[in-house]
Amino acid sequence: MAIPQFFLLLVSLFHHAFAQDFPIGVTSPLATSCGPDNANVVCLDRYASVLPYHFFRRFSGGSTDISFAQTNVPHDTSFDLVGNADFLVFDQERGLELLGSNPTYDKVFNVSEAVHEAPVYVPSLNKLFLSILAPPAGVLQPQLVVDLNQDPPTLSEYFSDPPVYAPNGGTFYNGLIYWGASGGNRSIGGIEQVPGIQTLDPHTNKTKTLLNNYYGLYFNCVDDLIVDKTGAIWFTDPQYSWFNRLVETPPQLLTASYRFDPKTGAVTMIDDTIVQPNGIAMSPDGKHIYITETGAVTGSIVRGGPPGSPFNQTGPRAIYKFDLIDGGTHVTNKRPIWYAQDWVPDGIKMAANGDIITGSGPGVDIIDPYGVLIARIQTDYIVQNIAFVGEELTEMWLVGQGGISRVRWNLKGQDLAAI
């Protein structure tokens, strides 16, 4: 019996529609619960690199962030697991290894929507020091300390002596906290400050200014910093202090990254190609510098212009890797290794094995030294920075806008106290 022509057409159309919904290469389910039974872990098949049509992730812009977990994938309901997971694993072998047998994620403190930054762990006190950044300019905010000797940990406020205005980045070296002080005003708590580098002795609460100008010009916003084994300080200088009105003076310098030698007072530029250099870290072997680019979040530098720095999804938001040269005093061979899949890569820290950990939107990405995403921690607030704590350095604290959280896993952090 002959098959009617219109029936063959319907079959062809149905086959075409099915092929569009489920292209060759799609495996189902895309997402599965995995890892230890006690943890909320979800594994993605092959990075979800082939999604069934019609999928769609809405545009992020202004102050609105649409995360990967919010991608609409109507033809694979397993993707609904992604949004509720604490840990997303993209590389199952390495991801489950770094999580270990008993990973946990806990939101320990609810805090204000102000930016929380510069977490620094002091081993001798077993305390985590961090800062609050909030406009308007000249309003001195108390800093915070998490006492890890208490169970549960406690959060308290303090002012250093003299107080430091708006520490935006911090690290630990030779018994001292090193702060990138990002704010400036003619009178803050009765003293004058501009962006620069300061130290805090956590045992005496005394602070000291190490750097506050570039040949008479104000730095824009000393954002983040690291100290190498020689005592040299590497730091970034974007323009966020002006965008957020933590300073009174519009930018006087190009955004750039620098190396400062406190033994001599000399400051040398190491890079001026990044639109808004932000986080900075050095590999455990001392061979590479990593700098995060947050140029997708940029505002107006014009006096009288609108404050704030809206997000532009198509703007630059990468992590760059550099090689150290000239006896470890300069960098070369800049190359992008990671393009943030969510918001911008902000604070950055190193694991002992060389993996990179960066706060990025509502969560933290764990990336290998070549820019391959291994796993992600998901939060309900924007994470600005992270710090490893404890004797084994396998506990990590996340700080940001609205929350302070704790992760316990198998990934060990870089031992800053050993530098």
Which sequence ranges carry the predicted segments?
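Beta-strand-rich domains and repeat architectures in extracellular enzymes and scaffolds
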Residues: 27-141
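Fungal secretory targeting signals
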Residues: 1-20
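Short, conserved, GDST-rich strand-edge loop motifs in beta-rich repeat architectures
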Residues: 66-68, 77, 131-137, 180-192, ...
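Blade-level signature of beta-propeller repeat domains, shared across WD40, Kelch, NHL, RCC1
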Residues: 385-419
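Blade-loop segments of beta-propeller domains
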Residues: 115, 132-187, 192-196, 209-214
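Blade-edge beta-strand/turn elements of extracellular beta-propeller
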Residues: 91-110, 149-163, 203-216, 254-276, ...
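Beta-rich, blade/repeat-based domains predominating
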Residues: 111-125, 162-186, 214-233, 240-241, ...
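Short loop/turn segments immediately following beta-strands, especially the blade-tip
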Residues: 146-150, 312, 321-329, 409-416
